[in-house]
Amino acid sequence: MAKLALIEREKKRAKLVAKYADKRANLKAIIDDQEKSEEERYLARLELQKLPRNANPTRQRNRCAITGRPRGTFRKFGLARNKIREIAFKGEIPGLTKASW
């Protein structure tokens, strides 16, 4: 199980990403707009740099909802591979069966 501090840090990052998503999207649109003047685009770039570093969605890490494991996490379930296996064998994930051919 991952340390609680790491899990909480990821939750904090998720909140920051959600909080600044609109502002970030607006600034990115201004930066990418060729119709705007160079000065406007430059000022938008400076504003984007002033946003918190953790407001960037690329800094988020997918973690298992149960254990906090950072690797081997399936996006569809939000769980690590070993927890998916345990829960699937118990039959607690509807529609998921063990493959056999």
Swiss-Prot record:
The lineage of its organism: Bacteria, Pseudomonadati, Pseudomonadota, Betaproteobacteria, Burkholderiales. Keywords: Ribonucleoprotein, Ribosomal protein, RNA-binding, rRNA-binding. GO terms for biological process: translation. Part of the 30S ribosomal subunit. Contacts proteins S3 and S10. SUPFAM superfamilies: Glucocorticoid receptor-like (DNA-binding domain) (SSF57716). GO terms for cellular component: cytoplasm; small ribosomal subunit. InterPro entries: Ribosomal_uS14, Ribosomal_uS14_bac/plastid. Binds 16S rRNA, required for the assembly of 30S particles and may also be responsible for determining the conformation of the 16S rRNA at the A site. One of its GO terms (molecular function) is rRNA binding. Belongs to the universal ribosomal protein uS14 family. NCBIfam families: PRK08881.1 (NF006477). It holds the Pfam family Ribosomal_S14. It comes from Cupriavidus metallidurans (strain ATCC 43123 / DSM 2839 / NBRC 102507 / CH34) (Ralstonia metallidurans). This is Small ribosomal subunit protein uS14.
